[in-house]
Amino acid sequence: MGARRTRGAKFMRMTFHLILGAAALLATASVSAVPKGDEPIAVPRTIKQGIDFVYVDPQMSSVAKRRQRPQNWLQRVLSFDSGASSRKNAPNPLFVQLGRGLQQYQASWGRLPQVKIPAGAALRRGSTGKRVDLLRTRLGLSPGGGYDEQLVQIVTAYQGVHGLSPADGIAGKATIASLNRGATYYARRIAINLERAYRLPPTRTFNRYVVVDSGAAETYLFDRDRVADRMRVVVGSAKTKTPMMAVIMRSAKVNPYWNVPPELIQSLTAKRVNEQGLSYLKDFHYEVLSDWTATAQLVEPKTINWKQVAKGKSGILVRQLPGPWNSMGNMKFEMPNDYGIYLHDTPHKELFAENDRWLSNGCVRLQDYRRFATWVFGDVPQAASPREQRFELPRPVPIYMTYLTVAPSANGVVFRPDPYGLDALAMPQMFGAPSKMASAFDPKQTAGGG
């Protein structure tokens, strides 16, 4: 067994020699103060977007600074031993699972011939010809057998691992494009996600913490490094991404106001007022304020030049009143940050039944705020009146907002779509120029679709 493991580790290092070059290119996660500014989110230049967190709270920054990143971490992953000693020395369980997944991916798909298959009509059961022979070779079968049942099963398995839907055994345009990207491309995507996993809390750092995964549009509640609960969330769209940041949740508000971000006042609120008149504000329970202080005065909407607001030449402050119509729903969980990002309830529960949940303006909408509040407080806080009321958390809870496009599975990994395009952004940061096989195809094309 030991000899086999040694041979396997050597093979991994040989097969993924391009990946190993990343070790020299990667640096410790940058720690930087969050810049002041309105939406859209302005990320510090020192941050590698798609890889690093913005550490908002000084306590989170100090945790990040204490971590010493091993220079040869990627080599360690490729020669990973799944024994107890390796698990003990790993930064966190997800890192271990993805490291094992990288090995299993290499064993299942990395050693296959990396031949190119020309574009053409979809290939399916019964198809024959040169392209079918190339497909068989690419997937480790001998040529000449046609598109038989064995090939159907292997194509179906490949589609399932690589996030190609439907996984129907038909080699269509997206499947051929995925195969032509080559194993190095996908191994690098696993490595990018290992980088993201490395930045999550090390084992035994916090008793309780929350991980918001914008790549999966899901949230995980951790008790002593084990998932105590999970739920679907709605996160930012591709245009208004939920940022990768580490922050501490310290309070929550029941019956919250929604303070409309300046960008939305210009692009949405002012536009609707100009189209529908001032009645729009009343119909949707908006009010204009003089400032954000406790003694703020209401501003008469008819005194405002809404056309100038829509052009961005006049700034105003708008908030939505508490109630069933409010975009924050019944409860907002506050995490002090200059991005205006919160976890909150929503009146639009129907969205959680959808697979496409990349719909918000950057905030995180919770599928079940009551379940979340019970985990945080021990019970759901009750306001004394319909007015907004603030509740301090019994203990501050760290929140890690990450972005994972590869998930560990029983047989290795499963690739997800890259809705924010952050894998494509991180690829040159980690590896320089794309590999020849990857660059031969459109880098903007997603892996999804059969």
Regions found by a protein language model. Name each.
Residues 5-19:
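Bacterial N-terminal signal peptides that target proteins for export
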Residues 20-25:
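Hydrophobic helical h-region of N-terminal Sec-dependent signal peptides
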